[in-house]
Amino acid sequence: MIIEISHFLSILATGLFFLVGYFSIFTPTSNSNYLSSLITRTYSQGFFFLFFSFLIYVWLAITDNFNVAYIANHSNTALPTFYKITSIWSAHEGSMFLWIVFLSLWGFIFNIRVNNNEILKPKSMGIISFILVGFLVFLLATSNPFVTILPIPPLNGADINPVLQDPALAIHPPTLYLGYVGFVIPFACAIAFLLHGDSEINWEALVKKWSVSAWVFLTIGITLGSWWAYYELGWGGYWFWDPVENVALMPWLAATAFIHSLGVSIKSSQLRIWTILLSILVFSLSLFGAFIVRSGIIDSVHSFANDPDRGLYLLGFIGLIVFTSVFLFVWRLSSIKSSSVIKKFSKQSFISINNILFGTLIFSVMLGVTYPLIYEFLFDQKISVGAPFYNAIFIPVVVLASIFLFFSVDSKWSRSINFEFFTAPIFLSAALSLALTFFVMQFFNTQSISILASIFAGSLIIFRYIYEIINFLFKKKYVNPFSVIAHMSLGLLLVSISFNSLLSTERALSIDINSMEEYKDLKIFFEDIGVENNSNYDSIQASFLVEDQNGRAFNLKPEKRRYFTRGQITTETAIHVTALRDIYITIGDQLDDGSWVVNVQINYLIRWIWFSALLMGFAGIILVFSKRVKA
């Protein structure tokens, strides 16, 4: 059968990647152009075998080949073709397959883009190849997507999880995976640098754009996941500190610190030790995320598997990677040449301080994720760590980091602050930020220190970079577009989150059909409720006519769906979007008196939160494709 061909190609790819790893690491490739060329060709062959194996798998899903157990368990003939494709990464085995294909893709692009004369390339390719072998063995031995149902396959499949039948799922997981595994490039180059032991090799310049590329994918992936959960799961917010959200946040925080540290290392040969350590940390946290999601040790809407064997394999494999990396780092530590003199209040000093603050955030998230697991293991009781814990740490640390970022704009490389540092941009930005903060405090009658501090810090960054843009427009002074857009996005993100927390409201209403309720400035009229029939589900759809204080009226139609195959019931939100707020309605159960529970949320500036995050990603794209822009 065709599935056997796909299976065989993946096994063949595993063998080729092993050969690349062995010859790259254990033979002197730097003295053999032929061997370097052979390694390049062999890796490419392994990638194409694996890629074609995946393409065959996609074709089998599209054509409803229920001989394949995974497809039978997660697809259905009634599914549109689009969802038959996305069903491949809707569960553990298929998503792991996609993860590995993307990992090999990063290696392939690095393989063909980097010249064979690059001294770090052979060993980097070897490290990537051995990591691929480890994950492929995990896939084939514990999570085999090629298992068949013999002798008689089912006539129809079990269907995909209804909450995953959404267009965003075509983009969110693949983008997130590309971000996770993309950090294999800086990790592999850092380890190759340690293996060579030559401190003069400029590995940082080699990995700069690769690192930013992975960071862009991770940023966009996290943002899309937040948006998807908002409208699909009925949570009505942008972030809920779910454990799997958190394990995506940790590598993003580490990667952000790594990219800044990388810029310092390239510019001044400082923080080189930090940079290597952060490259190891970023990839290790990406692997830790894979372990958390796929080991079954947590309950989450995002988790895939519940198999101790898989968890033990992943834990052992990740432990081997981390232990080997740290051992090499400690072994070569004394030979790494890095200028240790960082002048007070120089740009490097502010970046170093913020790296420490980012480390604090990473540690707090790691503690929040792992402490409940450890507690349950020791005492056989479940506990959870929620938003109050994270907010208590994140708000002051992020505000402090933003203030250091503000001062770093006017600081110089390798120079301490002098009197000229305290110039008009600093005083003007600070004055405008204080004025805005005072206005918010008075106009909205709030005494919340966390909200006011966040608005102050965010606006501080925005006003300072607006000054930079004005300088560019009228004085033609060069500005770094990556830095300006990325950091202004951070400021906008802080301000948007603050106003969202300050202004957003929620209320559960009990409404009869043909009756009206008022909430805030809204009049909500429950017009009707009806039944809709579709190819793979039917639904109860409510119709509401909503009118705001300006007389603008619009219809909202939330649903409760029942999917035929699984019999699962889901809630579909109805959202009216404006520039400043979302009107968000979900329908609950019918009460004994015939009325319906209707949950109404007014979410201010929530779209600006996602816009800010996507703008950060856009800034990264500018850096990746620009020849002039420097990190």
Q: Could you tell me what each predicted segment is?
A:
Residues 1-33, 45, 50-52, 66, ...:
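Contiguous transmembrane helix-bundle modules in multi-pass membrane proteins
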Residues 50-72, 86-107, 138-147, 249, ...:
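Transmembrane-helix bundle segments that line or gate the permeation/cavity pathway
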Residues 174, 181-191, 203-260, 274, ...:
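Extended, hydrophobic alpha-helical segments in both membrane/secreted and soluble proteins
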Residues 22-39, 69, 103-125, 191-207, ...:
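Membrane-interfacial helix termini and the short, flexible loops that connect transmembrane helices
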Residues 42-48, 127-128, 202-224, 266-286, ...:
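Interfacial and helix-entry/exit segments of alpha-helical transmembrane bundles
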Residues 427, 491-630:
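Accessory, solvent-exposed terminal regions and/or long lumenal/extracellular loops of proteins
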Residues 11-22, 95-150, 156-226:
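A conserved hydrophobic secondary-structure block that centers on an alpha-helix together
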Residues 1-9, 32-36, 59-93, 144-173, ...:
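Membrane-interface interhelical loops and short amphipathic "cap" helices
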